[in-house]
Regions:
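Glycine-rich anion-binding loops of enzyme active sites
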Residues: 42-45, 52, 86-175, 289
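Active-site-proximal betaalpha loop/short-helix elements
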Residues: 98-101, 175, 188-257
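Small-aliphatic-rich amphipathic alpha-helix that forms the alpha element of a beta-alpha
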Residues: 65-91, 108-119, 220-225
Length: 321
């Protein structure tokens, strides 16, 4: 079985044990990337699946039903962005509880899914509808990709870059948990995240060597890139682009940002950054560098603040005790 290119954590330790039991059913390509890739004629398809569960990924007192559908679809489609893929379609398994006075909930949720799909030129291809003890969506996304970018391609000397601004989703979540309604723009960062599919395609065609979407938090997802590519990653916290009112360490820990963390060759220039911004309307910031890997002293991820190492903030882990 191919190696599982993931960083540390209880969730990923469990995945390693699960994949070790797959035997001949395991794929030959490395497991643990954002999408599975396979050829269909002359087309390379990118496929991924993502779950959103009430009480874990969303709460009904924070989001309306359309937002629940939109956010769930965005989380799934973001995996396609991380591979540089175009979105084709979605399959949705929707679980709804028994009558709770919300007779139009399923329609509203699916309207939100459809709106998110339409925004990236994708279709809702079908799915399944079941009774469940709470609201739940499993969304399978299908895309096509010309130049896939995986987590395993970074090399020593590559620059580490990130799209957009970090920390907004975490700040919005903090305010929602405190019972405060965030300002509209900040709330939308959590409720209706912007997708980076166009940015992912641009980066893929302009030489990105490795890429991942930020779902568990910048620091945690950098560990996945480091493990998959067998390089060290050094990130300068002072360089992190972040929302107003968010400190650098909080920005590095904020999950479900759905921005792209990526590596580019050393020759990627300021002129290329300007072209990217002009073509996509998205910010792109260099935040660090890839260092020697292969078991060397500089493997793993190191965060620097004022040139001093700081403790990595933990990313989200479904199975942490």
């Amino acid at each position: 079985m191919a190696a599982l290119g993931m960083g540390p954590g209880a969730e990923f330790d469990l995945l390693r044990r699960i994949f070790a039991r797959l035997g001949d059913a395991a794929p030959s390509d490395p497991l643990g990337d954002d999408c599975a890739l396979f050829k269909l004629g002359g087309t390379t398809l990118a496929v991924s699946i993502d779950s959103s569960l009430e009480g874990v990924h969303f709460r009904r007192d924070w989001l309306d039903f359309m937002e629940i559908g939109y956010r769930s679809a965005a989380a799934a489609l973001s995996d396609l962005a991380a591979d540089g893929a175009d979105a084709i379609g979605l399959l949705v398994s929707l679980g709804v509880p028994r009558a709770d006075g919300q007779e139009h909930a399923a329609e509203e949720i699916m309207a939100g899914v459809a709106q998110c799909a339409q925004n990236v030129g994708a279709s809702v291809l079908g799915g399944d509808l079941v009774r469940f003890d709470r609201y739940m969506l499993d969304i399978c996304v299908i895309g096509s990709v010309q130049r896939p970018v995986r987590r395993a391609g970074a090399s020593e000397g590559d620059g580490v870059w990130v799209t957009g601004y970090l920390g907004g989703a975490g700040l919005a979540l903090e305010q929602l948990r405190a019972g405060t309604r965030p300002p509209t723009a900040l709330r939308n960062r959590y409720a209706c995240p912007e997708l980076r599919l166009q940015a992912g395609r641009w980066l893929a065609t302009h030489g990105a060597t490795a890429m991942i979407d930020i779902s568990d938090g910048l620091a945690a997802d950098a560990e996945h890139l480091s493990a998959a590519s067998d390089v060290g990653i050094e990130i300068n916290l002072e360089q992190l682009p972040r929302w107003e009112g968010v400190d650098a360490l909080a920005a590095a820990a904020s999950g479900e940002e759905f921005e792209l963390l990526l590596t580019m060759p050393p020759h990627f220039s300021d002129a290329s950054v300007s072209t990217f911004r002009g073509d996509t309307g998205v910010e792109l910031t260099r935040i660090g560098v890839c260092l020697r890997g292969g078991g060397g002293r500089r493997g793993g991820v190191r965060l620097l603040k004022d040139r001093e190492s700081v403790t990595l903030p933990p990313g989200y882990d479904h199975f942490r005790q």
